[in-house]
Every structure is written in C-alpha cells, then in structure tokens.
From Swiss-Prot:
<dbReference type="GO" id="GO:0015833">
    <property type="term" value="P:peptide transport"/>
</dbReference>
<dbReference type="InterPro" id="IPR003439">
    <property type="entry name" value="ABC_transporter-like_ATP-bd"/>
</dbReference>
<dbReference type="InterPro" id="IPR017871">
    <property type="entry name" value="ABC_transporter-like_CS"/>
</dbReference>
<keyword id="KW-0547">Nucleotide-binding</keyword>
<dbReference type="Pfam" id="PF08352">
    <property type="entry name" value="oligo_HPY"/>
</dbReference>
<feature type="domain" description="ABC transporter">
    <location>
        <begin position="7"/>
        <end position="263"/>
    </location>
</feature>
<keyword id="KW-0997">Cell inner membrane</keyword>
<dbReference type="Pfam" id="PF00005">
    <property type="entry name" value="ABC_tran"/>
</dbReference>
<feature type="binding site">
    <location>
        <begin position="43"/>
        <end position="50"/>
    </location>
    <ligand>
        <name>ATP</name>
    </ligand>
</feature>
<dbReference type="GO" id="GO:0005886">
    <property type="term" value="C:plasma membrane"/>
</dbReference>
<dbReference type="InterPro" id="IPR027417">
    <property type="entry name" value="P-loop_NTPase"/>
</dbReference>
<keyword id="KW-0067">ATP-binding</keyword>
<keyword id="KW-0813">Transport</keyword>
<comment type="subunit">
    <text>The complex is composed of two ATP-binding proteins (BAB2_0817 and BAB2_0818), two transmembrane proteins (BAB2_0815) and a solute-binding protein (BAB2_0812).</text>
</comment>
<protein>
    <recommendedName>
        <fullName>Putative peptide import ATP-binding protein BAB2_0817</fullName>
        <ecNumber>7.4.2.-</ecNumber>
    </recommendedName>
</protein>
<dbReference type="InterPro" id="IPR013563">
    <property type="entry name" value="Oligopep_ABC_C"/>
</dbReference>
<comment type="similarity">
    <text>Belongs to the ABC transporter superfamily.</text>
</comment>
Length: 338
C-alpha cells in the first residue's frame, strides 16, 4: 500500500468575519492522514475540531468563514493531488461526496426528511457518475445491506423518521461511502447514540475502512473511542494543535497539560463507586475554554494550567518535537509526566 498521504494539511488558518473584527478559529494546523489510517482529532467544544473538518470540506458559511492561509492537499482516486484550499467551488463540488465523504454527528439534520433513504444514498452516484436512478437505487440497497441494515430494499423506500437512530447513522455512513471515497471525515458520528449502538457503528466503520483502504479523520471528544479506532491522535485547544502523536504513546506519555487533563477526566469502570465510597469527585479541568474573540496572551491554556509559569503568558509556544512522531506545544514538556 502506498504511503503517500491521502490528506496533507499545512499551516491551515480559518477565519470568521464579524461586524466588529475577524476571528481566527483555526490557526497553523498541520495534519497528515495516510491510506488506511485513522487520525483522531480531539478536544473540548470550541477547540476548533469541527471548523477544521468543515474547512477541509469547504462547507464554511459563505461570506462569514474563509480559509485565510495554508494548504489542504488531497490525493484523489485518480492518484492526482489537488489543493482544496485553492480550488473554486465548482471544482470542489466534483470532489465533495466523490473523493471525500463526510459522516455528521446528527443524522436527522444531515438526512432530508422529504426524500427516501434510497434516493438520498444514491444521489452522489447520479451527481458524480451520471448513474440512472434505478442503478443508483440498486447500489444503495446493496450498500445498506453491507452496513448492516436488515431488509435493505424495504428500508431504502422509507423516510428518515421511520428508521431508528442507529439505522439513520448507518444510512449516513452508506451515503458518505457510496462513491468509494479515498478519504472520510467522521464528525462525532456516535455522540447521539447509546453505548451499544456506538460500539456497532465503530466496528462497522473499521470494517469498511479495512475493506477500502481509505484514510479517515475521526473528530471526537471521547478519548475512549480514540483508543479503540485511531492510530494517531491530534489534540486541539482554542484553534491550535497542542499535542499530536501515536495514540498509544500520547495516552501513555502525554506531554501537554491539556492532554493530561483530558485523560485524567475520563471516567473508568468502577471509578464512580470507589470515588463515592471515598468521598472524592471525578477529575475535571478547571476553568472554561476561552472565547476565540478574547484569547489570553501567550499559551491559551495557561490560565487553566497548573504547570504555567510567567513565560507561558509571554508568547505562543512552538510545537516542539518530543520525538520524531510526537509533538507538544508546551515549553515545559520535558518536565511533564502523567
């Protein structure tokens, strides 16, 4: 399998324009995704995860959000590369849904309530390949069966409200994969599902990825999911990457206080009962994610950080190399141990 990246983002900077000023939502982001690899993008709400994925898809609100700098190099099915940050909307439409698929967090908002499931799943084939409606429907039925929806032909004729939450999410996965994309963005695809269905969806996505060899960017705040599905992890805070590296290494040896805080905040089996017995509380990260319009000077995490020193407030730290594959945006990373 080729190890040329499917996706190579360098220096991505995304800006939102308000009446008063321009606000930087994503700043100096670098992400590489290889064929067959899953990279998890994690952080609290407001960290810039979803804006990063919407920037890749070029789905930012028109006249409000725009890519101000950087490149997003995609290697499509033809093997040719294209900079998604530089092409016009017409060219992007030919790529979106064809070379790149996206699974959204809430299927009821990404499925049209007035069209049948089969019509919606088959639409990318009609748009990108000129497939007839009948052929597109047959392909949709086949894919619904592959993603584990029983009685697929009948379900293809139903509307979104007639399916359970788990079935709707399977349908959105089918819609994202119908054109066999080389790259998939999964933006919090299991958040709205119960734990049992969540596990089934994760297993399904891993199976489909294994069969196709596509690269995947998995956006989530759930570190338990990251440990299960991803090979590498990118941690974002206030629009910047603060740590990145192989999942096992970052989880075992985090070198940024924010990553440490996220890991320590994860509830584990048996924790609640034992902590209640001892009169203890679950670990939390003090404070709140700052608003992007009012970021503190220096390191944005410094006001919440127990490791912060005066120098942390003076300038934004560079992303330092812990080793060849592991980076941390902390001037004290060498002193930090979980």
């Amino acid at each position: 399998m080729s190890r040329q990246p499917i996706l190579d983002i360098e220096g991505l900077r995304t800006v939102f324009r308000t009446r008063a000023r321009e606000i930087v939502a994503v700043n100096d982001v670098d992400i590489v995704v290889n064929p067959g690899e899953t990279v998890a993008l994690v952080g609290e709400s407001g960290s810039g995860k979803s804006v990063t994925s919407l920037s890749i898809m070029r789905l930012l609100a028109r006249k409000v959000g725009f890519i101000d700098a950087g490149s997003i190099i995609l290697r499509g099915k033809s093997g040719q590369t294209v900079d998604l940050a530089a092409i016009d909307e017409e060219a992007m439409r030919r790529i979106r849904g064809n070379d790149i698929g996206m699974v959204f967090q809430e299927p009821m908002t990404s499925l049209n309530p007035v069209y049948t499931i089969g019509d919606q799943i088959g639409e990318p084939l009609r748009v990108h390949r000129g497939t007839s409606r009948r052929e597109a429907l047959e392909a949709a039925v086949e894919l619904l069966d592959r993603v584990g929806i029983p009685d697929a032909r009948r379900r293809a004729g139903q509307y979104p409200h007639e399916l359970s939450g788990g079935m709707r999410q399977r349908a959105t996965i089918a819609m994202a994969l119908i054109c066999n994309p080389t790259f998939l963005i999964a933006d919090e695809p299991t958040t709205a599902l119960d734990v049992t269905i969540q596990a089934q969806i994760l297993d399904l996505m891993q199976k489909l990825q294994s069969e196709s060899g596509m690269g995947m960017l998995f956006v989530t705040h759930n570190l338990g999911v990251v440990a299960e599905i991803a090979q590498r992890v990118v941690v974002m805070y206030a629009g910047r990457i603060v740590e990145s590296g192989p999942v096992k290494e970052v989880f075992r040896n985090p070198r940024h206080p924010y990553t440490m805080g996220l890991l320590r905040s994860m509830p584990r089996l048996g924790d609640a009962t034992e902590m209640k017995r001892r009169g203890e509380k679950l670990n939390t990260i003090p404070g709140m994610v700052p608003g992007l319009a009012n970021l503190p000077s220096g390191c944005a995490f410094a006001p919440r950080c127990s490791f912060a020193v005066e120098a942390c407030h003076a300038a934004v730290p560079p992303l330092a190399s812990v080793n060849e594959h592991h980076g941390s945006r902390c001037i004290r990373w060498q002193e930090i141990a979980a």
